[in-house]
Amino acid sequence: MFRLFVFIIILLFVHSDKYTYASNSSEQLGSVNFSTSASAPAQEQFLHGVAALHSFWYTEALSAFKKSITLDPDFAMGYWGLAMAYNHPLWEEQDYESANIFLSKIKNISKLTQKEQDYIQAIRILYGTGDKLVRDKSYSKAMKNIYRKYPNDLEAACFYSLSMLGVARNTVNKLRLQVEAGSIALEVFQKNPNHPCAAHYVIHAFDHPDLARLALPS
């Protein structure tokens, strides 16, 4: 039953135009809910950027986050979003220098909500010092803590899932991490079928010959 369920979900997302990321419409990216301290206009751009991130549409994400900080120059999470858009874990790509330029603009985080502070502290680990794989693993642990701390935060679930997929590419526990990442993405789907991360992360999590049985009915 579980395998059939996964298979149906993947078919729905693969063949649904609603989830085509190369679109000019925010609605076609799906729906995300990520509360921040931003002004309303900046928040709208921020949400569009987050949805684009989950769709791997990084140029659009950069554009949206840049608009958000233009509307609200002190919007810390807008700079967080820009740094996130320079990290492409599934392709092992990262623009370390550009990301840190934007992260350096985040000053006093004590005025932010605790959740915002947690996200910013996590991304500072991602773009900290040291070997990239070590940073990736430490970031994934930080996102795991956020995921556990805020069990109703679907964005925490999504970004934790993605962090595991990034780490899985270079670890002996690859299949275990992919299954765990995929199961979390499926949980997101159950809570919000329109969330873009559910579609994309499930597909990438089970994109392996040894996991094909999870996506195909017996």
Show where each model-derived region lies.
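Bacterial N-terminal signal peptides
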Residues: 5-15
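Alpha-helical tetratricopeptide repeat
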Residues: 39-53, 80, 118-124, 158, ...
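Residue-level recognition of tetratricopeptide repeat
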Residues: 41, 75-76, 153-156, 194-196
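Conserved structural position within tetratricopeptide repeats
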Residues: 67-70, 107-108, 147-148, 189-190
